[in-house]
């Protein structure tokens, strides 16, 4: 009886364990999916803030490990830390939207025999296209052949799994097909379409959709940048991709950048110096471009840019902390010039915090603020933790002098009163004797 009870108890425990185990695996899968969705949603929410944090956009995915525009490169870029992956799309002869930068396949593709494919993608059907292999990295004859294939846009979205957003370029002419693919993959909220149309075209297209897609306009072929930015942002775009060969072009100046305030994001492609004013895709280039107002950076160096972004965040945190200390400082007993200098530096620090993503600007603002704080005095603290400054020392000395003067005056008056009483008492005594 005892053995039977023990067996039943063990069986019951095992049954409960198995019952709990299967839902646990199910929750784990759901949790992973939710993590991806939550990540892309977080990036989307950050992107929507015109004064938000820097955004890292990987150009064509992680090409150090996989062929550009491959599903594997896209997913690897997200794993490496990219917020968004920039991809180019083309359309096959039978209407499939696939990832490919060039109209001609010769740079990236080989057939099953290893021969370079010298065909235009618009002349090839998807069935034939899917038999080709991609060359490694950015392609060309010197790159080895890989097992990677050309993915459809839908396959790339599925492979990415919501771990980053997609920025879809070169597909504006078949935007309706792209929209339908995104809607079918439930990816309208984590994919961005790059629009090359004018305000009227963009506005009309957005208005025709029941669910608003995310769109960034591109000023490359649209004349006056200042006007284009203003008009396309008001039409519903969440940002504008700007480009110029001249480093002093208006797109890098306050007139154009001011149009993004509380309206959208300024986007720049740093992977080609000819379209970003001769600047390089490195910390020096990022610092200069973020100083000018750009906050969404298309790069080939995900890890390098993320390191730069981390330094910017660190300097912002430091400046915020020092700003709070400066604002809490009592300057009532300091000289007017020193107090005014601190006040001016505080104003400049606030402006930098609210408008700049440049590493050097944040660093310089923090340094200036610390210098202004140190200029208040050779600061020390007494046993009670009170700050002692020359102004306060002078005040204490003046108070002591006042007390001494008061004591002298009080003592003089007291002596006069005593002397007067003695005189009066002497007179009264003399009158009594008479």
Regions found by a protein language model. Give the residues of each.
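Beta-rich interaction/scaffold domains
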Residues: 313-393, 397-399, 403-416
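N-terminal secretory signal peptides that target proteins for export/translocation
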Residues: 1-5
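Short stretches within intrinsically disordered, low-complexity N-terminal or propeptide regions
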Residues: 17, 30-31, 328, 351, ...
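Sec-dependent N-terminal signal peptides of Gram-positive bacterial secreted proteins and lipoproteins
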Residues: 6-27, 395-411
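Phosphate-group recognition and catalysis centered on beta-loop-alpha active-site segments
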Residues: 11-14, 27-314
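Cytoplasmic C-terminal tails of single-pass
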Residues: 414-434
